[in-house]
Amino acid sequence: MEKLLHYVWKHRILPLGDLSTTDGRRVEVIDPGTHNSDRGPDFFNAKVLIDGMLWAGNVEIHLRSSDWYRHGHDSDAAYDGVVLHVTQDADCEVTTSQQRSIPQVCLQVPAALAADYQTLLHTDEFPRCHHILASMSPLRVHGWMDRLLAERMQQRAGQVMARVDAFGGDWERACFVTLCRNFGFGLNGDVFERWAKCISLQAAGKHRDHLFQVEALFLGMAGLIGHAFAPEESDLAMRTQQEFDFLANKFSLTPTLQYADWKYLRTRPQNFPHVRIRQIARLYHSGQAQMDALLNVHSVQELHERLGAAGLSASATRLILINTVAPLLYAYGSSRGEEKWTDRATDMLEELPAENNRILRVWKECGLRVTSAADSQALIQLKKMYCDRLDCLRCQFGYAYLRSSAARGDRQGGTTESTDTTDPLG
């Protein structure tokens, strides 16, 4: 409930009558301040008038005043700049580490708002705010989708950069591992990443021109040679094993994975790990899995053709473009401060058609436009980072839902008015 009190303060859903401190001084909120999600006071740089005197500083919010002491703020100098303490229950006075008494305001969450917030949290429906979506302005919806897409790209680029850092700035290796992980298409993603990290690109590079040797190396390191061939291909399986044994001895390689590590159940034949590893081998052999090759492509169609040549279906190719190529380009551009790469990544998503899955079909049924991969990636981000975490208070859709509650409470003769028109993350 404290999060909801933050929401009420941030968006100035304040009493219709005069707001006053616990000792009777009139309070007027000029600026609620900037919400702080890190350590320290909840709102920075707020401005309030207390009995006509302007106070500029920080605001701290608790359900009870005694929480101030329970959290140790009375002995923490980081809270000495607090000029107003907002609480639902003023059960004691509060002071700073310098023994300065802090004015307090009792602020209640409007009943209609609290009820609708509880409905959002406890409904089994998805999305919880579905009935408000059709009435939202296209401008607000599109603005929120743009921010969600940027958030998702930054998050996925961060995952790429973590690999780059882990590999000592080696973009080529980070590219290979990122690509291989996404060839797991979810179910085998973690295992593919483990496998890719075991591959010696130095060893593979010495035999890149020979596809048979690359396949033998890749399948052998995956522990899958004995499961990658049909019974009538026993001779080929034996030669592949012999080739891998030769390469493993030459480069002192030891397989760390075995068949049991891979998931075959509930996997379609085209997604069997050994099938995907052969496709990766063909990409590596042709040079299309290299970072330079991805950076120097000129169109989505060209990328489609390059990846398709490795035996990927059109839908699998699109997923690799969305989940591998776009994040790599975005990460590369962000790390170098070059927008041409980040723009190319987002342009690629806007050009590619949206994925087709259950989550996106539900959003479509709610009236949202889902035509490109940019749209679908934004809505996947919304589902994973907001809906699944019940983080409705930071969501534009949740904001619109709860704002209607505040307005309804006012119309019904309630005690609140919402004067704020900013978005929940601003």
Where are these regions (language model features)?
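Catalytic micro-motifs at enzyme active sites that drive phosphoryl/nucleotidyl and oxygen chemistry
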Residues: 32-37, 45-50, 67-75, 90-96, ...
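Internal, well-ordered alpha/beta segment that forms a basic, Gly-enriched binding/recognition surface
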Residues: 86-204
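Elongated alpha-helical scaffolds
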Residues: 77-88
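N-terminal ordered "arm"
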Residues: 7-66, 79
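Hydrophobic, aromatic-lined core segments that form the binding pocket/scaffold
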Residues: 148-378, 391
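Acidic, carboxylate-rich catalytic segments that either coordinate divalent cations
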Residues: 365-408
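Short, low-complexity, charge-dense intrinsically disordered segments
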Residues: 416-426
